[in-house]
C-alpha cells in the first residue's frame, strides 16, 4: 500500500546506524509510524526536527505494519522559534500531547487543523491565551 500525504513530525528516534523511526501526524492518514532510511545524513538530519511539516511518501507491505517513509521538507516551522524558549516548549508540548492522545492510522482532520492553527497562534501578540484555548480543543 503506497500513499502520499503532508504531516507534522511528532517524534524521531534513532533506529540503527543509518535509519530512524519517525512518527508523523498527517492530514489524511492520522498518526503514522515508519522507518526513514538515511536519516543520519547531514542533508536529512538537519531538518528532522519536531514540529516541521513534511511531504511524506509511504510504502507499507501490509496494513498495520511499520512502513518505509521517504520525506521531503514542506515547511520549516520549529527553528524559527529556537530563540524563544516558551514558544518552543509549547510546540513540543502540543506535539507530545497529540502523540499520546491519538491512535495510529485513525484520521482526524480536526487535530491536523489544530496543528496548522498552532503555528498561526504563536505569531500573535497574545499567543499564550490563544494557546490555552488551543490546548483545551486538543484535549
Please provide the spans of the model-predicted regions.
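Non-catalytic alpha-helical scaffolds and adjoining flexible linkers that form interface surfaces
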Residues: 1-20, 25-139
Amino acid at each position: 500500500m503506497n500513499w502520499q500525504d503532508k504531516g507534522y513530525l511528532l517524534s524521531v528516534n534513532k533506529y540503527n546506524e543509518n535509519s530512524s523511526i519517525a512518527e508523523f501526524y498527517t492530514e489524511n492518514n492520522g498518526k503514522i509510524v515508519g522507518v526513514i532510511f538515511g536519516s543520519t545524513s547531514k542533508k536529512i538530519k538537519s531538518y528532522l526536527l519536531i514540529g516541521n511539516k513534511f511531504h511524506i511518501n509511504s510504502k507499507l507491505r501490509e496494513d498495520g505494519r511499520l512502513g518505509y517513509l521517504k520525506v521531503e521538507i514542506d515547511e520549516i516551522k520549529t527553528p524559527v522559534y529556537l530563540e524563544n524558549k516558551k514558544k518552543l516548549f509549547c510546540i513540543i508540548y502540543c506535539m507530545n500531547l497529540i502523540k499520546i492522545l491519538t491512535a495510529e492510522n485513525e484520521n482526524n482532520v480536526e487535530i491536523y487543523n489544530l496543528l496548522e492553527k498552532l503555528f498561526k497562534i504563536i505569531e500573535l501578540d497574545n499567543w499564550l491565551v490563544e494557546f490555552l484555548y488551543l490546548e483545551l480543543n486538543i484535549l
